[in-house]
């Protein structure tokens, strides 16, 4: 490009990082050097900064004085953004300095006139006037120290303030006691309340399990369930047993009772309200299974499988119960002993629960597993073989969808 082309003016936008002055638009030429631009800014810029104190930054790069603008500026940009940074030796003067100086002189003259008229002014009043003048001259600056921290440090240590956002936004009314953390964790009372709630829920679940086990063993569940709640029970005032306890003991109990979440057995409405589509689906599955057995085996095997499936179905329906019910047949004269044993067992279990809660409920799972293992009798060889066979043939029979608890 020739010399005439270098005389084309270029528009620069000078920005101040402290936002003290607005953006200044400067017109210059491409053949200017950075040093010449600084000299021009020292005459044109509002703060009149010295050339040696100026630092020009363009596109994140510090511009040295010997470079020309044609080697730095991008040709495709119409406006070029340049940041002007000045050192602290010659800070830019504030445009409000004259008004602050006038207000300071007015306050000083007022203080002098008031002191001359009174003639007995104290040093504290003059100090307060100077403090007001100093605060008015330092308008716009942020206070980063507490006013009471310098005057009374002991009081500031005794009553710590809660920090909210800036240091300027401290509220003296939001004080906390000494020695208490500013952001405390859970209160000890809250921790004790949570532990009590956990122990209560665990105790309720344990009582539900004990009552269900007592119901399955055909014990008088209604008197036994109310014994743990009656802590003020006197042994000599025990009511006589009801006459229908013998009939309840001799009555066979259904051990496979599904419990509802709200209490009580689950009513399987799907067993009573099964539509024709459900029945067709069940019969189709059974027909497919029997057809596979019939076409891929002999007639004798087909009859054997049909008989086994029929026996398993009748067993599931309750026609052939194989469970021993010797525990259910007890003498009527042992009702009082059974009630006392159940009461003593419940009291021992309640004491065990209190001991576990005092220990922190650390080894609850191990103890429960040990008690369950000792309470359950080991099945014999014939019972294991029968369970294996029934489980195998039961898996071959199609069943309906699983029941969903409420």
UniProtKB/Swiss-Prot annotation:
Residue intervals passing through the bilayer: 302-322
Keyword field: Membrane, Transmembrane, Transmembrane helix, Unfolded protein response
Organism lineage string: Eukaryota, Metazoa, Chordata, Craniata, Vertebrata
Compositionally biased intervals (Polar residues): 145-156
Gene that encodes it: HERPUD2
Protein name according to UniProt: Homocysteine-responsive endoplasmic reticulum-resident ubiquitin-like domain member 2 protein
A Pfam short name: ubiquitin
Function statement: Could be involved in the unfolded protein response (UPR) pathway.
Biased amino acid composition, Low complexity: 87-98, 109-139
Record organism: Bos taurus (Bovine)
Gene3D superfamilies for the chain: Phosphatidylinositol 3-kinase Catalytic Subunit, Chain A, domain 1
